């Protein structure tokens, strides 16, 4: 089986979505019957994270434009490689060319619209909902997010699976003072 992972989040600033993808796929790489294709601009960065193995492949993205990437580049890559499944965060390509796994981490822009521009809310409500409804496998990270997806997008509860956020192994056992210092935290709410 060939599985493409949209790893473009590894090209930008560090965020929770990156930790989620890294946690899932570093553990899945041991499944040698799956060929993993990680797609991003910075292939060297991905190589440093996921390493080298016979079932690990890297695909360099050429476009930095999200619309071009989702409307043109991914459908072409998926077709060229003969990908069986592709995993996207929030928004899948406009043209469906394989089975899709979509993770929607949250819908904060719908839960708290006052903190988001109207254009962002309208665009993402349409794209997230379309991606969620078309997904062959729809994932989210918590019961709260699952309930919000059901409420906002009217998607059957049975179609949504929870894959909780986790802590990366390298962060396990870090002393609390080190964590507080790295976060610049002086308050006592972390104990």
Please tell me what each predicted stretch does.
Residues 1-191:
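Carbohydrate transferase catalytic cores enriched for Leloir-type hexosyltransferases
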């Amino acid at each position: 089986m060939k599985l493409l992972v949209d790893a473009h989040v590894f090209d930008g600033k560090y965020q929770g979505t990156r930790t989620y993808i890294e946690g899932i796929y570093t553990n899945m790489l041991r499944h040698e019957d799956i060929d993993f294709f990680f797609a991003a601009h910075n292939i060297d960065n991905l190589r440093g994270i996921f390493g080298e193995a016979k079932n690990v492949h890297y695909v360099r993205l050429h476009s930095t434009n999200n619309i071009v990437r989702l409307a043109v580049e991914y459908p072409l890559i998926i077709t060229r490689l003969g990908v069986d499944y592709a995993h996207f965060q929030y928004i899948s390509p406009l043209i469906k060319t394989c089975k899709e796994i979509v993770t929607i981490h949250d819908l904060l822009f719908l839960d708290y619209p006052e903190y988001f521009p109207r254009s962002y809310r309208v665009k993402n409500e349409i794209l997230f909902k379309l991606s969620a409804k078309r997904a062959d496998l729809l994932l989210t990270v918590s019961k709260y997010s699952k309930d919000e997806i059901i409420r906002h997008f009217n998607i059957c509860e049975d179609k949504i699976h929870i894959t909780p956020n986790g802590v990366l192994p390298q962060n396990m056992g870090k002393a609390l003072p080190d964590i507080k210092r790295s976060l610049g935290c002086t308050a006592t709410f972390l104990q």
